[in-house]
């Protein structure tokens, strides 16, 4: 298989970029070990990851890389006061399981989250990768899809479309189909759990007709299915750098109602690099076959970073085979970074950049107030309750899937953000305030 993800000229250019460190002011010398090692020496980085995540990432290799640069790495024990384990310049974490358990009123998890938040509140100088309110938004598909819809409306880029979606909060009744049609969805569509983390979050279904709705188990989110020639592009983001990995996805299906039985599948299994099944076997390429556009991916990644204040996340993107538009179908907090060979280097570079103040959190952008007003108005129009208790929140276009033949990856480097290129504080505050779930972490 070709090691290039994109067409030859584009791919070669990006492969060369993958071998180099991001060219940001102040970090060029760091790549040679001098300036960075001097600056990082004596810094302390704490981390909390599950044992499974530590093994999967081989995180001890990152700890060793840090130690070679003079950085002390501390594995945090949240059952003990974090204050006693400090001081800490940076904390890296994946508390998704703990947060979800805390939301279920698990006393031990509630205590862990409280202790973590208590330390954050007492030490605003400590950099958190990533903020808990943002993680809570990404754990909720309905909220993250609404965020994507708002970002799409803000960007006004015809190359981007956000799939129509609905949240179902109770069993579907007689009015559900009318509500689905009213909100712009059409068969077939994908049904997913609202919670975007854990084993169950990968269990999905393709619904082809009204009969298939009977098997839907709320609470869940339904999202329009967009044919994309069985290719999924996973974008793994680390600060201002990202890597695009091509994966298998679901094959094309005819638009409109059909007598097909619903298809139940595990998206994790379908989109594995080595996946091969009838669900991913493409009969033929239909319509257009567009490759991801670097500028589009860069702008989507930047908008998400600035709206949520996140650094470690993944974006699942498909290309509509009728329009060539990029559709974001899922966002994941701190993914597995499979296929990202330079993850640890990118992470350390990002930590250095943040500590040096080279990654601006937010700056001024003229139209942020207009976006807040526009998105607020649309939000009001898009929430309605049916007599059956179904709650719908519609997205503005159509799309979703997972698939591909190659596990090749290509590294794409971001340029350093300029002072006037970020989303304004009011936009960031608006997104987080309206989309993040209530939690003790806020």
Say what each PLM segment does:
Residues 93, 191, 223, 315, ...:
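Active-site flanking residues adjacent to catalytic metal/cofactor-binding acidic residues
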Residues 290-294, 301-341, 410-411, 436-438:
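Conserved metal-phosphate-binding beta-hairpin within the catalytic cores
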Residues 66-86:
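A short, well-structured beta->alpha microelement
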Residues 67, 120-122, 306:
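Anion (oxyanion) recognition and catalysis
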Residues 253-260, 337-346:
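A short, polar/charged loop-to-alpha-helix boundary motif
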Residues 69-71, 155-161, 307-311:
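Short secondary-structure junctions
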């Amino acid at each position: 298989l070709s090691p290039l993800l994109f067409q030859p000229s584009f791919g070669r250019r990006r492969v060369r970029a993958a071998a180099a460190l991001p060219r940001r002011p102040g970090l060029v010398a760091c790549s040679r070990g001098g300036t960075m090692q001097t600056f990082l020496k004596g810094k302390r980085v704490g981390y909390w990851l599950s044992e499974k995540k530590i093994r999967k990432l081989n995180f001890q290799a990152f700890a060793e890389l840090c130690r070679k640069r003079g950085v002390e790495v501390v594995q945090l024990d949240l059952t003990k006061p974090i204050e006693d384990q400090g001081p800490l310049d940076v904390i890296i974490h994946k508390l998704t399981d703990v947060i979800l358990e805390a939301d279920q009123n698990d006393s031990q998890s509630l205590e862990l989250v409280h202790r973590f938040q208590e330390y954050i509140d007492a030490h605003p100088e400590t950099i958190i990768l990533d903020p808990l309110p943002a993680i809570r938004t990404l754990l909720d598909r309905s909220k993250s899809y609404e965020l994507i819809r708002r970002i799409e409306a803000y960007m006004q880029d015809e190359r981007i479309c956000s799939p129509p979606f609905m949240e179902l909060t109770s069993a579907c009744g007689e009015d559900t189909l009318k509500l689905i049609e009213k909100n712009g969805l059409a068969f077939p569509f994908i049904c997913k759990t609202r919670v975007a983390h854990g084993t169950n979050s990968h269990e999905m279904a393709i619904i082809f007709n009204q009969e298939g709705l009977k098997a839907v188990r709320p609470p869940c989110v339904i999202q329009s299915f967009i044919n994309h020639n069985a290719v999924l592009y996973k974008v793994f983001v680390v600060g201002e750098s990202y890597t695009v990995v091509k994966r298998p996805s679901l094959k094309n299906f005819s638009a409109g109602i059909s007598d097909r039985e619903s298809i139940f599948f595990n998206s994790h299994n379908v989109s594995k690099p080595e996946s091969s099944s009838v669900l991913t076997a493409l009969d033929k390429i239909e319509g257009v076959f567009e490759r991801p556009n670097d500028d589009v991916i860069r702008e989507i990644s930047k908008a998400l970073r600035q709206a949520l204040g996140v650094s470690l996340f993944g974006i699942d993107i498909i290309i509509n085979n009728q329009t060539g538009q990029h559709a974001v179908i899922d966002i994941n907090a701190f993914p597995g970074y499979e296929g990202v060979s330079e993850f640890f280097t990118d992470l350390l570079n990002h930590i250095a950049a943040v500590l040096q103040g080279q990654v601006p959190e937010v700056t001024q952008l003229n139209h942020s107030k207009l976006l807040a007003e526009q998105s607020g108005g649309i939000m009001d129009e898009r929430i309605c309750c049916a007599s059956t208790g179904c709650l719908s929140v519609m997205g503005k276009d159509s799309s979703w899937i997972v698939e591909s033949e190659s596990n090749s990856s290509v590294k794409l480097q971001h340029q350093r953000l300029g002072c006037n290129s970020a989303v304004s504080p009011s936009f960031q505050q608006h997104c987080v305030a309206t989309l993040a779930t209530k939690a003790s972490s806020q």
